[in-house]
Amino acid sequence: MRKTITDIQQMKVRGEPIAMLTAYDAVTAALFDAAGVPMLLVGDSLGDNVLGFGSTIPVTIDDMVRHTAAVARGAQSALIVADMPFLTYATLEMAVVAARRLMQEGGAQAVKLEGGQAMTPIVRRLVECGVPVMGHLGYTPQSAHVFGKVRVQGRSVAAARRLIEDALALESAGAFALVLELVPAPLAAAITERLRIPTIGIGAGPHCDGQVQVSTDMLGLRDDFKPRHARRFADLAPIIRNAAAAYIAAVGERSFPADEHSSRMDETVLREALEGLS
């Protein structure tokens, strides 16, 4: 049976850490689901981890719906949260339309959006419409052009206070959980203590209620990128390269396909089929 919002929130009540991973396709989602991951995020990180873009900005709602649907087909138990991509929730009307597509067409059980107090009318409206909303504070990738570069957020008194106020405002608006990205660990701990809803950290220290990692980072699929806050639990890039090289070599030396990979045919049938043909 699929996990629910209540299941995730009860994990905070019990003090049980929440593990969340990004997923973008049915096969990977099924593997993560079988491992017992309680919550999967179909992130707009799809853009720079799957689609070859340099950021999340080019990702469209059509992209998100398509990949969310794939993940929903692959994972039968995990709660599926889908990112609302750049500028799809600039107004109340746009937000409702985007959320409807992600849930009706994509099969998500919840959506995630970035931003603080300015987003509370959007969060409140979506919740009123029956859409569970996860917030996202700290470094918000959709604002990459505003930030200029990836950096830790909330290090000054004013910035830290603003993050705390934003977190409380999102909870008050009805968010069921909150991602804290690139936030100093002590500040993330203070926010976590003040909220009734779960906090999910990424580069926010060990004291959040849960953690989320981009799956390509966690699996070691990229040699060119290793964020400081990420830990590689596998190193799949060389394994995949070596497998591809072995396949190329096997084809080149005609050791693949072998007899066991091929289908047989009655020689008489083939001979009769070829009769009269040039």
UniProtKB/Swiss-Prot annotation:
It comes from the Bacteria. Keywords: Cytoplasm, Magnesium, Metal-binding, Pantothenate biosynthesis, Transferase. Its cofactor is Mg(2+). Pathway: Cofactor biosynthesis; (R)-pantothenate biosynthesis; (R)-pantoate from 3-methyl-2-oxobutanoate: step 1/2. It is an enzyme of class 2 (transferase). Pfam families: Pantoate_transf. Mg(2+) binds at D44, D83, E114. Belongs to the PanB family. This is 3-methyl-2-oxobutanoate hydroxymethyltransferase.
